[in-house]
Amino acid sequence: MYQVVASDLDGTLLAPDHRLTPYAKETLKLLTQKGLHFVFATGRHHIDVGQIRDNLGIQAYMITSNGARVHDTDGNLLFAHNLDRDIAADLFGVMHSSPDIITNVYRDDEWFMNRHRPEEMRFFKEAVFN
């Protein structure tokens, strides 16, 4: 019997319209009610994923930022691996100079982008990052 179920969000758990289907919501609720542990494993920001989890009303671990952060079911930070400041500055400088690259930088509870693209808001149907 499975004890843990983990899933990505984009292209996996979320439908093509970037929303959780009623079936997905019900399945996640049933999994956690049966005592299985659910883990969100995604490249998204932890606040974004936390809103999705809270809207579902379930207890779930979160592995976010492509594995750079891990939060427990209460949202407490268990693990963080941040880029060295000099490396991050170098990467951001290279990417910032190219108009075709959009850079997303997460720092604790903050999210920075080098350019705002309104069309990217379609990815945030289940949670709104302020």
Where are these regions (language model features)?
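Glycine-rich loop at the start of a catalytic domain that most often binds anionic cofactors/ligands
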Residues: 51-58, 116-120
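Charged helix-capping and loop-helix junction motifs
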Residues: 21-23, 84-85
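Asp-based phosphoryl-transfer active-site loop
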Residues: 2-17, 91
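HAD-like small-molecule phosphatases
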Residues: 68-130
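Catalytic-core regions built around general acid/base machinery
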Residues: 23-35, 90, 94
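Substrate-recognition element of Asp-dependent hydrolases with the DxDx(T/V) motif
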Residues: 28-51, 66, 104-107
